[in-house]
Amino acid sequence: MNHIITISREFGSGGRTVGKKVAEQLGIPCYDSELIQKIAEESGFAENYVKEAGEYTPGGFLSSALSNRAFGPTNEDILWEIQCRVISELAEKGPCVIVGRCADYTLQDKAKCLKVFIHADMAFRAKRIVEVYGEREQSPEQRLRDKDKRRAAYHRFYTNMKWGYAQNYHITLDSGELGIDKCADIIADLYKSRA
């Protein structure tokens, strides 16, 4: 059975960067934007649609709960099924790091999975999204709250689990306190000790 690292993260915490650094240290693939591309190929949906709909419930939890599910699966439901299949197939290929997309839930019974959650305080994340992503559309703090709220709603909707809740992960790390590189080192060391 393959050893997989899943990284869930707050927006702006550097989880994607941590995942890439861990993969580099361990010499294994990291799936983030590559995962979006694979899901888009399998589903026939545009990458931008997969990026948005594949991680967020449109309009939040309530509107999704009240959507047209009575008429059959929604595009989001179809995308969820394809996403789960693609994640499972990647995990079967060999050890890897998978960032986001509820991979921790998808792989909970299918792989030896080290489940990680990366978080940081609001000031660290706000500064980071301005510096790294050039976010300037609205206040960085509001953008962080909105993205995190949508991620949490999506995670709860499809997994019935609380996103970011420490008991749902093997380890949670504060990238603002520890730094991106130290988080990557800790995860890589923990992975090696479990292999």
Which residues does each predicted region cover?
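ATP-dependent small-molecule kinase phosphotransfer cores
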Residues: A40-P95
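Short, amphipathic alpha-helical "lid/cap" segments that border enzyme active or binding sites
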Residues: C84, I180-A188
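Short beta-strand-centered segment that lines the nucleotide-binding/catalytic pocket of NTP-utilizing
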Residues: P29-A40
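Pre-Walker A (Motif I) flank of P-loop NTPase domains
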Residues: M1-R9, G94
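RNA pseudouridine synthases
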Residues: A103-D109
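Small-molecule kinase domains that catalyze NTP-dependent phosphoryl transfer to phosphate-bearing small molecules
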Residues: P58-A65, D77, R136-D181
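Conserved phosphate-donor/acceptor-positioning beta-strand/loop module used by diverse small-molecule
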Residues: D109-E131, E137-K147
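Glycine-rich phosphate-binding P-loop
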Residues: T6-K20
